[in-house]
Amino acid sequence: MSWRGRSTYYWPRPRRYVQPPEMIGPMRPEQFSDEVEPATPEEGEPATQRQDPAAAQEGEDEGASAGQGPKPEADSQEQGHPQTGCECEDGPDGQEMDPPNPEEVKTPEEGEGQSQC
């Protein structure tokens, strides 16, 4: 008598067919109102009124930030790591780097006993 168990291999499920966007219908510009270009001004209106309000706001922000001075980000990085005199870093992942090739390392002579940082 042979044993007939359930197979562990399952056939992949059929994928549902989704129509491509061009088959559904055209995109209506009112759905994406911020991407639509503004209407051209009439002859009587000055061209300065049709400027993008975001562009005008950027100009105001630049003037306000220019008077504040340098950003304190560089200072905060120095405060987190005290200086020890030897500024050797382990590497980008915090792991130690491979030791140098012994053939390339020069032995320190008398008077040159300083650290090789």
From Swiss-Prot:
This gene belongs to a family of genes organized in clustered repeats. They have a high degree of predicted sequence identity, but differ by scattered single nucleotide substitution. Their sequences contain either the antigenic peptide YYWPRPRRY or YRPRPRRY which is recognized by cytotoxic T-cells. Antigen, recognized on melanoma by autologous cytolytic T-lymphocytes. Expressed in a variety of tumor tissues but not in normal tissues, except testis. It comes from the Eukaryota. Transmembrane segments: none annotated. InterPro entries: GAGE, GAGE_fam. The gene is GAGE1. It comes from Homo sapiens (Human). This is G antigen 1. Residues 32-45, 87-96 have a biased composition (Acidic residues). Belongs to the GAGE family. Residues 1-117 are annotated as: Disordered.
